[in-house]
């Protein structure tokens, strides 16, 4: 019987020739927004391009989309996915008088106001807050963080419907347009701002494959986003960003309606005590794994590589431990958007993930997932789990899945096989968003459908085998496990075979 301790004592620390199964998401910015650099990033291991809609014009984001698609023409390789990260509803301070910064000492008492007359007249006496309900939801003694926690204030008194009296807990500067966090306070901001709605419509029009939805607090927030995406955006995957206490508290209900989750540790580490973040990360990832929904670990993973060619040892451990926790994807932000070493950062992340994957006790992980998954499962999930079990018993080298929607590869990925999941599909969108699922290597089969179903199945299987050989996953004589349907259409994946290449 496999034990975690025994597995780790035999751990191989060389990367070897194995294929990395954890996907890498990279934020595209001025340093990387050109086809040639995008090709280099993809060769280094990038699978999903992220556009941060907190910054940039539509013209700029259109250029990212165009350059991403141009990079596929220059280097076909594997399909590239495009993600739109919403700005989300947020709370900010106003503009300081004459746009100057006002230094304040510790224990400095001042006023926070929602009165619009202070919106462009903030100083060290009064600071404007653009959240109109702040005086209704916050209580005396609560903490308010400004500028990602650089400044901390304690609420001394809710003076009236427009005014809070506060005291600074540390020295700092009152600056313009800084973000505001209210840890431990339930806020009632809308799921989407008008800007977010416009951004989502832009994304649908331009064929993005997934949306990273910021500051999700409730399941209803997800349903609101789905409504805005509309019929034209019905295939866009919604990945919720959990970055506040409300999102953590309501996670089980959110998980039921979302397509996936991002553990967004930046704002989360401000909204909840920083020492709790790693435990919340493990808990949320485990719940996603059990639900069979993809999960992304993000924020400051290799942040020092924004300016340095090598990461800190703690950063490398952070990436590796996210993989061990069960993350399907790991994400880079400033490292690739504005950093001096974007290709190095992707390379280091890819190498770290590959070694971490070798530290996973796959059989024990599979057993846990099978034992804790509620029964009965769907026919497709039963076949998916059986395929992974067959890999262990037959010592197979790959699983080849013929899929239309990407749902079967997702369920195979849930059970964390130690081999590649080769997805063959005629659906380019499904191929691209399937990068969200750990271990899935998607390939688009462009040949016409054959009139005889069995011949069409064999043609697609042979295509999958050829691609697996091309990418170094298979060689002659290897054993493979295959999944396909008994008939054309969606939802028929019920046939499992064990074959020799």
UniProtKB/Swiss-Prot annotation:
It is an enzyme of class 2 (transferase). Transmembrane segments: none annotated. Its cofactor is Mg(2+); K(+). Substrate binds at residues 50, 266-267, 299. It holds the Pfam family PK_C. It comes from the Eukaryota. GO terms for molecular function: ATP binding; kinase activity; magnesium ion binding; potassium ion binding; pyruvate kinase activity. Mg(2+) binds at residues 243, 267. The record marks 241 as: Transition state stabilizer. Its EC number is 2.7.1.40. Homotetramer. Belongs to the pyruvate kinase family. This is Pyruvate kinase. It comes from Lachancea kluyveri (strain ATCC 58438 / CBS 3082 / BCRC 21498 / NBRC 1685 / JCM 7257 / NCYC 543 / NRRL Y-12651).
């Amino acid at each position: 019987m496999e034990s975690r301790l025994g597995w780790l004592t035999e751990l191989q620390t060389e990367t070897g020739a194995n294929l990395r199964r954890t996907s890498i998401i990279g934020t595209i910015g001025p340093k990387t927004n050109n086809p040639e650099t995008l090709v280099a990033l993809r060769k280094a291991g990038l699978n999903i391009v992220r556009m941060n809609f907190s910054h940039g014009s539509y013209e700029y984001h259109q250029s990212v989309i165009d350059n991403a698609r141009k990079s596929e023409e220059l280097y076909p390789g594997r399909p590239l996915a495009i993600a739109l990260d919403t700005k989300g509803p947020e709370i900010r301070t106003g503009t300081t008088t004459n746009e100057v910064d006002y230094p304040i000492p510790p224990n400095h008492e001042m006023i926070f106001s929602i009165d619009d007359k202070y919106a462009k007249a903030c100083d060290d006496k009064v600071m404007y807050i653009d959240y109109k309900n702040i005086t209704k939801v916050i209580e005396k003694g609560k903490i308010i963080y400004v500028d990602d926690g650089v400044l901390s204030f304690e609420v001394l008194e809710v003076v009236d419907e427009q005014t809070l009296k506060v005291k600074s807990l540390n020295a700092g500067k009152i600056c313009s347009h800084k973000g505001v966090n209210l840890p431990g306070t339930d806020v009632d901001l809308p799921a989407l701002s008008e800007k977010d709605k416009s951004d989502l419509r832009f994304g649908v029009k331009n064929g993005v494959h997934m949306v990273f939805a910021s500051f999700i607090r409730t399941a209803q927030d997800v349903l609101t986003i789905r409504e805005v995406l509309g019929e034209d955006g019905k295939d866009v995957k919604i990945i919720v960003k959990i970055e506040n206490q409300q999102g953590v508290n309501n996670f089980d209900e959110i998980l039921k309606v979302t397509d996936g989750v991002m553990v967004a540790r930046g704002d989360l580490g401000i909204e909840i005590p920083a020492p709790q973040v790693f435990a919340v990360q493990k808990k949320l990832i485990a719940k996603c794994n059990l639900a069979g929904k993809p999960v992304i670990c993000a924020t400051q993973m290799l942040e020092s590589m924004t300016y340095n060619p090598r990461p800190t040892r703690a950063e490398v451990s952070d990436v590796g431990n996210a993989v061990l926790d069960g993350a399907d994807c790991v994400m880079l932000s400033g490292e690739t958007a504005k950093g001096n070493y974007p290709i190095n950062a992707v390379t280091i992340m890819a190498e770290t993930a590959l070694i971490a994957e070798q530290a996973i006790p796959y059989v024990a992980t599979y057993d846990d997932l099978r034992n804790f998954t509620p029964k009965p499962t769907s026919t497709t999930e039963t076949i998916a789990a059986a395929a992974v079990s067959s890999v262990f018993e037959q010592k197979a080298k790959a699983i080849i899945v013929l899929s239309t929607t990407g749902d079967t590869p997702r369920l195979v990925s849930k059970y964390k096989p130690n081999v590649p999941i080769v997805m063959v599909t005629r659906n380019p969108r499904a191929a691209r968003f399937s990068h969200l699922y750990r271990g899935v290597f998607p390939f688009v089969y462009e040949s016409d459908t054959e009139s005889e179903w069995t011949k069409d199945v064999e043609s697609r299987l042979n295509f999958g085998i050829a691609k697996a050989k091309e990418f170094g996953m298979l060689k002659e004589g290897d054993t493979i496990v295959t999944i396909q349907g008994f008939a054309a259409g969606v939802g028929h994946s019920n046939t499992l075979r064990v074959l020799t290449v």
